[in-house]
Amino acid sequence: MSSKKWVLVFLVTVLVLAALLAALNLAADPFGAFGDRLLSWFSYDETNNPRVAKFSYLEQHHDEYDSYILGCSSTSSFPVDAFNEAYGASFYNLIMYGADMRDCEKIARYLIEHYEVKNLILNVYLDNGLTYDEESDRLTKNLHYKEDPDTSVLSYYTRYLFADPRYALAKLNALRTDTILPQTFDVFDERTGCYDKRVRDAEPIGSEERYLESYPVFADYPHQTLSLPYTEQCMQSVAAIKTLCEEAGVNLTVAAGPVYAEYLKNYEPETIAQFYRSLAQVTPFWDFSSSSVSCEMRYFYDGTHFRNNVGEMISARMTGRTDLWIPDDFGTYVTADTPEDYFLNVLSPAALSADEISTQVPILMYHHLSEDVTNSEMVSPEQFEAQIRALSEAGYTGVSFDELQAYVLRGEPLPEKPVVITFDDGYRSNYTLAYPILQKYGMKATIFAIGVSFGTDHYKDTDYAITPHFGAAEAAEMTASGLISIQSHTYDMHQWPPYETGSAVRENILQLSSESEEAYVQALTEDFTRSRALLEGATGQPVDVLAYPAGQYSTLTQVTLQSLGVHVTLSTNPGVNTVVKGLPQTLYAMLRFGITEDVSPEALLNMIQ
């Protein structure tokens, strides 16, 4: 082959390979740079580059929104739905990786000039003074060229058309392993723009010791010396955003999100004071940066990102809601006239004591009462009364799950020594034997009834006799007393294999091995919906608590039940619960002590202390 032909073949080969690479990147579009027209998987694209992918998403959906939230990654916890309700608006959260106020300015300008914008919420985080106008990665940290006048059209398209093919191939491979819940490759909720925290927000939270086991970063927090060299430039961009909003008639609200107390120690006090002092000279703002919330690690996902529950507190404080517990020192409206002492004290948040934000709640688990005790799930009426009497004489007060929710969500007080008494399955003995004893001592209790066994003494669709279960009339009488609540133990996800004829037996609430996620979610939804309708129809009381059969569950179980309005779930693991104000996760998979005939009154008291 002549040299000319060799060169020609080489050039043609290069062009063909380049065309194939461009076609692959255009079709897969792993950054959403071209609008992701084929796969339309923006939660994946936004994980690679939220700046570019969210722009592409809004180009197709901006008519669904009229308000926006801007800021670094911690801004994700600013709750879109809560602000929608408070403002009567449709917010989209434009959080991005990194804290770059220059990018916020460019995005705000594009939004105001091209979309309908009624409200803009800007989160100014401390790190906005640490970096500025920094494109650390041309694929993952840059803006769309339409938002960034410093990026040419040619530069933008060539970098994405000829990007490393491994990005596109990774997206195609992820399609095969995608699940209902978020994974590391699709961490965003494309509808809201926020991080998809369904998994993190479903995890049970309890004592500080348990939290440190799950999040060791808080046990040995990494410190480093940091400065804020770009405070002036940051404030110039904030001022530019303010001017843009004023000229366009956009309602601008500025907030400074919570910073974990240990992270604040990375900076010199005067450096931080100057940052917030400078912000106050530019615009009034809601300051949440340093408070008792900053001192409580359980309010943070990690060392820099506060939980969505804290975001709800932010929204409530900013909009004047009073139906949510908020620490008194959380959220100050700061202006140019705020006294100098305020900025000097920003590094001195006072932690709330454990007694101020949490309480210890033991939960007891019973099943069946009988004069003839033949197994570990039975307790005699005499022993049960002795146990209840011991609780009463020791100063314990039976509380309901409604009271626990009121404590966590609204900060309503609990008795000094609360205890929760529960019964699983809904046996008739709960009505004939336990209920009179509970009445005698004024002790509240919750009974978790199996729907398919409600009011029957035979196993479903068979002639097999079972221990009798109470029905609607008894349930109505007990709940009318104010002492008893009837809640769900599922409708038919606590099956007994010897009495089942099908091949797939649901002994518990877990997904069957042969079942897809979608089929499982549908089955669980139908089961709980049926259980709730049955029990609410019998008692007229809301059903929003579920005890897991055999204590077994998965993250998908918990997430699905939360979406159905279940606010409390219970396991069968032993231990005393640490219930924390502002953290509904402390009501998930709650611990319970299984109480048997062998537990003496003295042993019971020792167990729960």
Where do the PLM segments sit?
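Membrane/wall-proximal cationic-aromatic binding patches
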Residues: 30-93, 100-110, 397, 402-409
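C-terminal regions of proteins
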Residues: 268-349, 581-607
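Secreted/periplasmic serine-hydrolase-like ester/acetyl group-modifying domain
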Residues: 137-247, 331-351
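Conserved, well-ordered alpha-helix/loop/beta-strand core segments that scaffold catalytic motifs
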Residues: 120-129, 192-284, 538, 545, ...
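Membrane-embedded segments
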Residues: 64, 69-156, 416, 430-433
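His/Asp/Glu-enriched short active-site or ligand-binding loop at hydrolase and phosphoryl-transfer sites
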Residues: 285-293, 449, 454, 508-517, ...
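N-terminal pre-catalytic segment of deacetylase/amide-hydrolase enzymes
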Residues: 350-419, 588-596, 605, 609
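Metal-dependent polysaccharide deacetylase catalytic core of the NodB/CE4 family, i.e.
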Residues: 297-300, 359-374, 417-419, 439-554, ...
